[in-house]
């Protein structure tokens, strides 16, 4: 890794006029010139693309327990296990016959 770059402690939040941003990955850059600018001059202002989704909305809290629908006539289909049992038995027999020959 270049000596001029170092990983910053992440994740962290940045508070701006537009809202709060979560930074998941950041790179600390050393020995780089800082350009001072004013907000009225748009040539050096950070551009932030507005998200297409609505502003941060709180999702409704998830249920505290799993609710199961009890339908006595409806059963969950299961895979036939004898198919796997037959496959393993055939494999075992093949290995045994190779060892004996």
UniProtKB/Swiss-Prot annotation:
This is Phosphoprotein OPG062. The gene is OPG062. GO terms for molecular function: DNA binding. Belongs to the orthopoxvirus OPG062 family. Originally annotated as the product of the F18R open reading frame (protein F18), it is now referred as protein F17 since there are only 17 open reading frames in the HindIII fragment. The modification Phosphoserine is found at residues 53, 62. Residues 51-73 are annotated as: Disordered. Phosphorylated on two serines. While these phosphorylations do not play a role in virion assembly; they are essential for the interaction with host RICTOR and RPTOR. Keywords: DNA-binding, Host-virus interaction, Inhibition of host innate immune response by virus, Late protein, Phosphoprotein, Viral immunoevasion, Virion. GO terms for cellular component: virion component. InterPro entries: Phosphoprotein_F17 (IPR006854).
């Amino acid at each position: 890794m270049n000596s001029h770059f170092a990983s910053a402690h992440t994740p962290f939040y940045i508070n701006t006029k537009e809202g709060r941003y979560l930074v998941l990955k950041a790179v600390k850059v050393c020995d780089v010139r800082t350009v001072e600018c004013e907000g009225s001059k748009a040539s050096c202002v950070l551009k932030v693309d507005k998200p297409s989704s609505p502003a941060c909305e709180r999702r409704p809290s998830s249920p505290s327990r799993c609710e199961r629908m009890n339908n006595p006539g409806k059963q969950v289909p299961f895979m036939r296990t004898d198919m796997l049992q037959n496959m393993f038995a055939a494999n075992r027999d093949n290995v045994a016959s190779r060892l004996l020959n």
